[in-house]
Amino acid sequence: MLGTNHKVSNGAQMSTGANTYKKLNEIRQRGGKCILIDPRRTESAKYMDEHHFITPHADSMFLIGLIQVIFAKGLAKPGRMAEHINGWSQIEPLVNQFDLGRIAEVTGIARSDIERIAEEFASANSAVCYGRTGVSMVQFAGLTQWLMQVMNVITGNMDEIGGMMFPKPAIESLPLTQSSWDTYRSRVTGRPEFSGEFPMAILGEEIMTPGEGQVRGLLGLAGNMVLSMADGHHTEKALNALEFYVAVDPYLNETTRFADVILPPCGPLEKGHYDMFYHLYDTINWSKYSPQLFETQSSKWTDFEIFTDLMACFARKRTANPLKKLFYGAIHTLVRHTLTTDRIVDLGLRFGPYGKGINPFNKKGLSLQKLKDNPHGIFLGNLEYSLPEGLYTADKKINLAPQCFVDDLPRLKAHFVDGGMEAEQSESEFDMKIISRLTN
């Protein structure tokens, strides 16, 4: 595990059923081992079999060392995924550009430990390389995320029991995302889109940089980007520079204080809830609906109702045609009073992989009413093989060496191998790493 603190996050996205410590302890009872790679002795470190300190930002180098050893020892074995992989032959030459001795030096992890961990991981009956926030918000984070999955693939642990597996949610939302990559780029620094979205990190530059396409208005739903994003002061300046900012949020906080208008929705206990996001990260297949606990006051609207009305207003403002205005108004009335969030959830459940459809005699199939009748949720089975059917690539294969990551390796090498890291340290006014190794 790299850069994850289960004791604090309770496992975050892998916490189905909570009690992460119990799950980690059960791994040991089965003869397994839990290894944590983290530059800080976190609250979770004391529960690990091993904790290795690592130089901040050097996670990619550590993973390259592991992969290099696995290939050198002849331990690379993709298992049943072998016929569903492209780019296998590229990986070994790519990692062999780096010297293992230098990797040990820049990561702070002994060469003998790197070799041992690589051999133990590749030789285990099942294993998984997993990382979270700590490796996602640092320099070379993209490379680190890629290399972790390379580790899982080359050791035969991708989509295998005991390895990296994927749930089958009761409402399949992934097919709706129309996943895409680099079909267009951002205006200022040319960042590629992913699934129709840009990273939040570029919002400030898109607001502050003049020119055609400059962001001048913002509609925000929840979140507190001044605190949650890096360089909050720059975000404050950007928000203050907007011509108009609408916040849909129940709170006046560090971000919404810049809004021209705040539209507060009803509270979370005043509306029903079905989780669409976290079911994508479950460690079992299950489904649960939480009904509202309190009646919504007539003056309060849900987020869905607020956005439904806003969309209707936008649509009518964008046309001068009276017939179109009338049509948009009729659609709005239909959606507002007929297509409620509960009905959307019910349709998703009924026509999902476990759904009852419109068959009234299908007693086993899922529907919203069935979830309401089982308030603690319904177990839908353990995780099962989902690849290659679950792949969204055109050829139904995993591209093990995407060009965007391959092209970024020279930057990694320049930083850690060709003296870039030492140059940065000598030019910096700071001579300390703000990382504590103190025991909690």
Question: Which residue stretches match the model-derived regions?
Answer:
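Surface-exposed loop and adjacent secondary-structure segments within mature catalytic domains
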Residues: 178-183
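Glycine-rich, small/polar surface segments that engage phosphate groups of diverse ligands
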Residues: 173-174
